[in-house]
């Protein structure tokens, strides 16, 4: 009961469903864990449902530069529509250098939303002196990320974890829903389609292949 949040009947259930994980984790990582301020520079690495919500959170907070990073050009295009000021394809060998060039040395905050060691490495290399890496993606439990202790000392970098966006559901979900209603958090643009039980396996395949952001499972659909 501590994590059950009542929503009123005016909010469509299909819209409400996305707030339970993707919105909390992405927006929360930016607003709660990092607590970015207006004028900060941000890189969102990994543009699934969580990463794109992180981008929306950065826009809401007034970040000066929001750099969207992914290997999928379609997702980079969507990121621009949602408010990214710059996009970088992580397939480019010089993608870290591109991020540094955009920000004259590195971002204040780099958010790892992809759940991979490679994305974490991109984040670490892309932050400026005194910058922070916020890891919100869940890599496989056997994954290891290595860094140079002298480098993290002399550069005063920080690496932090963010579990479910450091959210308290009964506090944060109503707040995010209200922002959505005010048109400040366009989470509905992340929903590709509704599917029925017969499409579940295909839906998971599309999610794995990066062909969709979020799908809503509606049992009555045949």
PLM regions: where:
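Hydrophobic alpha-helical segments typical of transmembrane helices
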Residues: 25, 54, 75, 95, ...
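Structural detector of well-ordered beta-strand residues that form the stable sheet scaffold
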Residues: 43, 67, 132-134, 160, ...
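Glycine-rich cofactor phosphate-binding loops and adjacent beta1-alpha1 units
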Residues: 34-37, 50, 71, 77-158, ...
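Rossmann-fold dehydrogenase core element
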Residues: 131-134, 147-189
